[in-house]
Amino acid sequence: MIKKLFIILCLTLFATNSFSAGSDPKPAKVKTDYAKAVESIKWAKKYEAKGKLEKAKKRYAKAQKLLLKSNSKKPNQADTLNYLGFTTRKLGDYENGEKYYLQGLAIEPNHIGINEYLGELYVATNRLDLAKERLKILENCNCEEYKELKQIIDGTKKSKY
């Protein structure tokens, strides 16, 4: 009797294990070029805050390449154009950074990030009148971006980025 119970128990265990061994695992999620770029930008900002500017620059360049790929696969996305403007500006190309920001604003005129970053670009290129126009758009958003841009325009704060 004990022998029969033992055999039944063993067969049950083996049957259970064989089913679990054959089950398919869930496929791993593949990160988009955009998601990889955003991650690279986060790292670049951390490096920049620590004064590791060469590492930051490499991360911005990597992010820019990923964003260009993302933009070619899925064009006219305001968030992608915002980050393209940002990385291009961070790499010192203000002219093309501005073009990306303006393309993004053509799609989404009240985009908070684009308006703030474009305002910062205008301050950096001594075009305060245009920076104030961006500030005016952010005026009613009740957001941190408005406060930061205002302080940067007023000269009471230096741009973090």
For the regions a protein language model found, what residue spans apply to each?
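Terminal, low-structured helical/coil segments at or just beyond the last alpha-helical repeat
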Residues: S23-K31, W43, K132-Y161
